[in-house]
Amino acid sequence: MNHLRLQILDQATCERLLERLANEAEWLDGSLTAGAHAKGGKRNFQINYDSALRKEIHELVERAMWNHPVVKGFCLPRKLHRFLISKTEKEGGYDTHVDNAYMSSGRSDLSFTLSLTDDTMYEGGDLEIDSISESYPIKLKQGEILIYPSTSLHRVCNVTSGIRTVCVGWIESYVQAENDRICLFQLESGARAVLAKHGRSDELDLIFLAYTNLLRRLGG
């Protein structure tokens, strides 16, 4: 499993944010924040990065991510950074691209998309992520987040009706290598499941010891 999908915001919070974005946001051409190779293929709008509303949403989403143990276990985050709020209207999308490896705010090991709109509010607009042999489309429900490797080619298909509004950003992990992160996540998840089912034991202490020392060794 190289991506994580789960709910981190409730519907009421998302609806409140959508209402504020509709009434207060200053929307700019989204291509202004695209890399040189992707600029021509980005057809969306983004809220002014310096606006108080963007900073408020950034803080809310970042807090929800830091407070979610599965997000922390999967990402092993050193830094969550460069939160952008974008909306894609009819005929808008974002052609195939890979995210920049380094930004002024940090390194991109993992990318995330948090959907403020529900998948019933628009048509088209699937996020497609390429694997070695195929592409798989993903459409998020309201309040769901998808976290995936920044090393992947991906795209946002054209929206055919409605409006797709999301918060996107990047994660710099303590563990840069994807396979190492996945192994650590599986080890910790298994250990915590055993702890919940059987309670503490000397044997389980050894597993947590191995996890901690592996994290220390693999982390940068």
From Swiss-Prot:
Record note on cofactor: Binds 1 Fe(2+) ion per subunit.
User: Which cofactors does this protein require?
Assistant: Fe(2+); L-ascorbate
What EC class is this? oxidoreductase
Top-level division of the source organism's lineage? Bacteria
**Annotated GO biological process:** DNA damage response; intracellular iron ion homeostasis
Q: Does the keyword Oxidoreductase apply?
A: yes
- Gene3D superfamilies per UniProt: q2cbj1_9rhob like domain
Per UniProt, the keywords (alphabetical) are: Dioxygenase, Iron, Metal-binding, Oxidoreductase, Vitamin C
Q: Which GO terms describe its molecular function?
A: 2-oxoglutarate-dependent dioxygenase activity; iron ion binding; L-ascorbic acid binding
Does this entry carry the keyword Iron?
A: yes
Q: Where does 2-oxoglutarate bind?
A: R164
A Pfam match is 2OG-FeII_Oxy_3
Q: What is its EC number?
A: 1.14.11.-
SMART domains assigned: P4Hc (SM00702)
Ranges for domain Fe2OG dioxygenase come to: 79-173
> Which InterPro entries does the record associate with it?
Oxoglu/Fe-dep_dioxygenase_dom (IPR005123), PKHD_hydroxylase (IPR023550), Pro_4_hyd_alph (IPR006620), Pro_4_hyd_alph_FE2OG_OXY (IPR044862)
Q: Where does Fe cation bind?
A: H97, D99, H154
* Protein's name in the database: PKHD-type hydroxylase sync_1544
Organism of derivation: Synechococcus sp. (strain CC9311)
Q: What is the lineage of its organism?
A: Bacteria, Bacillati, Cyanobacteriota, Cyanophyceae, Synechococcales
